[in-house]
């Protein structure tokens, strides 16, 4: 059985998955630490999406060299797997966003909003243009939920490092900070859902991934009743599989 090692090197964590090459089934997955995962020995090739900069790439290169496997460092392109990249300079689009959009399109084959709620919160719009074809129309990047909270705590003297919970009617500073950051993220998502829905003339599904997606999901489901919300944990890793296969 041929396997692909997919690696998503993000700003906070490096996630990996071993996927069955023919089907894309995830056989093993994890978060990279100091040890070389034993499961990597199952693989015959490696696909990497790195948005963490050259230092992280150098560390990964040193580890992957020990495996002796062919490695492809993916980048965003003008077109891949049925999706056209609307960026003025396609290569400047973060490859994690590109991979997530490709996976979302391949899974759902319809206009959709793709949200990655990590260190940054990215919200990207895909429009179906023809059977099997889509276009990335544009998207936004804003501080992620935790980064918003940490930035406020470091910049405001009377807030400090506090851990609140979401409440409809916050009555403490820590809960107000937590609730405010989640409302900010959910509001941005709602705005782009409305924008894309008006363009496409239909209710738009929202595909969520990233570490803070679980925190955003209940708020979105409660207040945005006309949209379908789908939680996908491994969009970037699955997108790398599609990119590696070069599926149409």
Curated annotation (Swiss-Prot):
The active site is at residue 96. One of its GO terms (biological process) is coenzyme A biosynthetic process. GO terms for molecular function: ATP binding; pantothenate kinase activity. ATP binds at residues 8-15, 119. A monovalent cation. Ammonium or potassium. Pfam families: Pan_kinase. Gene3D superfamilies: 3.30.420.40. Its EC number is 2.7.1.33. Substrate binds at residues 87, 94-97, 173. Homodimer. This is Type III pantothenate kinase. It comes from Methylobacillus flagellatus (strain ATCC 51484 / DSM 6875 / VKM B-1610 / KT).
